[in-house]
Regions:
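Active-site neighborhoods and metal-handling regions in enzymes and metal-associated proteins
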Residues: 1-271
Length: 271
C-alpha cells in the first residue's frame, strides 16, 4: 500500500469535493430533452470553473480508443463507460453519471444515478437498492478487516434482500495520483480460485479507495461491442451505478463524497 502524506490526503478531499460540486450542479440542471453531448459539455464547463480536469477524457487502455468524453454517461441498460452523443434524455430514463477529476494532483471519482423527469417503479427500486448497498458496504470497511467483508455486505443486500444482481467483472479500486490504483475491490466474493486474489487482504489505515456497486435488474452478465467503451447488461435490463471515495481509518472510514447522499433521485422536467 502507498502511504499518503497529510497534504495528499487533503488534496484528495479537495478533488472529491470537486466531484460532489459537479454532481450538485448537474442535479439542478438536468432536464428531459438534454442530449448526452450537452450534459458532457456542461460537465466540462464546471470543471473549468472549479479548476480541475477530467480524469477520463483521453484515458487509454489496451484494445480501446482514447475515451472521448469528460465524464461517463450511461443510460438505462448501459452499466458503465458511456460516451456522449446526440441522444436526448427521455422521461423516466436512468442516467448514471460517473465523474472523475484530477485536482491538485489527486483523483476524485464518484458516480450517482438519476431518474430524469420522473421515476419508474423499477427505477425507484434500483436507486434505493444502489444507495443502500453503498452505505452498507461502506459500513463494513475498517482497518484490519479483509476486503471481502465489503463484498459480503454489498452482495447480501443487493442479491438477497433486493433480489437484484451485481454485475460481475467490474469493481472498485484504489485512487491517488492516477485513476486506477491497487487494490481492486470486487463487489462479490470470489467464486473460484484466482478470481479476486486480494479478497482476504486487509483494509489498511490511510487507504484511499473508490468503492462502487453496479447493479442490474435482471442479470449478473455484461456485454460490449468490439473495442467500444460502453458496457451493457447482457439481457437489456435496467442498471444503476453508485460510487464513493473513502479513506480507511482505524474505526471505519471517512467518506470524502458523503454529501452525494443528499442528492435527489429524480431530477429535472422538460427543457
Amino acid at each position: 500500500m502507498i502511504l499518503r502524506t497529510a497534504k495528499e490526503i487533503e488534496d484528495a478531499r479537495a478533488a472529491a469535493m470537486c466531484v460532489v460540486e459537479t454532481h450538485r450542479r448537474l442535479a439542478g440542471w438536468l432536464r428531459v430533452g438534454h442530449t448526452l453531448a450537452e450534459v458532457d459539455a456542461f460537465c466540462g464547463s464546471i470543471f473549468e470553473e472549479l479548476k480541475c480536469k477530467s480524469a477520463f477524457i483521453g484515458y487509454k487502455v489496451r484494445g480501446h480508443p482514447p475515451f472521448r468524453s469528460h465524464t461517463c454517461l450511461s443510460v438505462n441498460d448501459m452499466v458503465v463507460h458511456g460516451e456522449h452523443d446526440a441522444t436526448p434524455l427521455a422521461e423516466g430514463d436512468l442516467l448514471a453519471l460517473d465523474i472523475g477529476v484530477k485536482h491538485r494532483g489527486m483523483i476524485g471519482d464518484a458516480a450517482w444515478t438519476y431518474s430524469i423527469g420522473s421515476a419508474t417503479e423499477m427505477g425507484k427500486r434500483l436507486q434505493a437498492c444502489g444507495r443502500e448497498s453503498l452505505r452498507r458496504g461502506i459500513a463494513a470497511i475498517k482497518a484490519g478487516r479483509p476486503m471481502i467483508e465489503w463484498a459480503k455486505a454489498v452482495q447480501g443486500y443487493v442479491e438477497r434482500d433486493c433480489r437484484f444482481h451485481l454485475v460481475r467483472g467490474l469493481g472498485g479500486h484504489g485512487i491517488g495520483h492516477t485513476l486506477h490504483e491497487s487494490p481492486y475491490i470486487a463487489n462479490t466474493p470470489p467464486s473460484y480460485p484466482g478470481e479476486w486474489t486480494e479478497a482476504w487482504k486487509p483494509f489498511e489505515k490511510g487507504m484511499l479507495i473508490a468503492v462502487e456497486p453496479m447493479i442490474s435488474a435482471g442479470t449478473t452478465e455484461i456485454r460490449s461491442k468490439g473495442n467500444a467503451w460502453p458496457i451493457w447488461t447482457a439481457d437489456g435490463s435496467l442498471s444503476v451505478h453508485y460510487e464513493a471515495d473513502v479513506m480507511v481509518t482505524d474505526d471505519g472510514c471517512e467518506v470524502f463524497t458523503a454529501a452525494l447522499d443528499e442528492l435527489p433521485d429524480v431530477v429535472g422536467g422538460k427543457a
